[in-house]
From Swiss-Prot:
Protein name per the record: 3-deoxy-manno-octulosonate cytidylyltransferase
Organism domain of life: Bacteria
Pfam families: CTP_transf_3
Chain's gene name: kdsB
GO cellular component: cytosol
Organism lineage: Bacteria, Pseudomonadati, Pseudomonadota, Gammaproteobacteria, Vibrionales
Amino acid sequence: MSFTVVIPARYSSSRLPGKPLADIGGKPMVQWVYEQAMQAGADDVIIATDDERVSAAVEQFGGKVCMTSPNHESGTERLAEVVEKMAIPADHIIVNVQGDEPLVPPVIIRQVADNLAASDAPMATLAVEIESEDEVFNPNAVKVVADERGYAMYFSRATIPWDRDNFAKQDKAIVNPLMRHIGIYAYRAGFINTYVNWAPSALEQIECLEQLRVLWYGEKIHVAVAKEAPAAGVDTPEDLEAVRAIVAKKA
């Protein structure tokens, strides 16, 4: 089963400017993500960027770059441009790996691609079981519920499903497992263009969750439990220091 990994790497970041080029153990962050994707067994790994500085860094370590428009409103629009520019066939599987996850486990990149290939959905993603009670009620931790066949029923920043009896108690203990969505997606390449040509849905605008557009228009998203929980991504200088510390310990 062949698949291509696309890694969006925007230079601009309000909380951490120049994030893709941030040094981690002597390598830019984007190179860490690229190397993890290569270990997953991808046929091709493409860095999608709108900045020449990122492009130059990628070329220096031997990676492949696709220059994209700086005007995209979403990561999926950037993917659509890559698919068009690189003439990727409609039935080919694309895995979108975030450029700020330098420690993403290769096994889950492969897993989400395999899951899509084995399903009849146009899109697949992964989730992990929530273990922290704080996370259950944190709107930044996106929850997902799936049906018995593993297809998403809904994604929400709210606590779903709401465990009525247990959450009525003062300690609100986690008795029944809840699933937190993790932001890795696999798509059939032709579906990406279909997606970006749909008008945004009311639900995705309310929740600020792009994936709800797929469910709104009646398509399916396959969801499975990740074989390995990914480390946190890098959004802030504090996150970057935490990842540097992890890498230094492994060295």
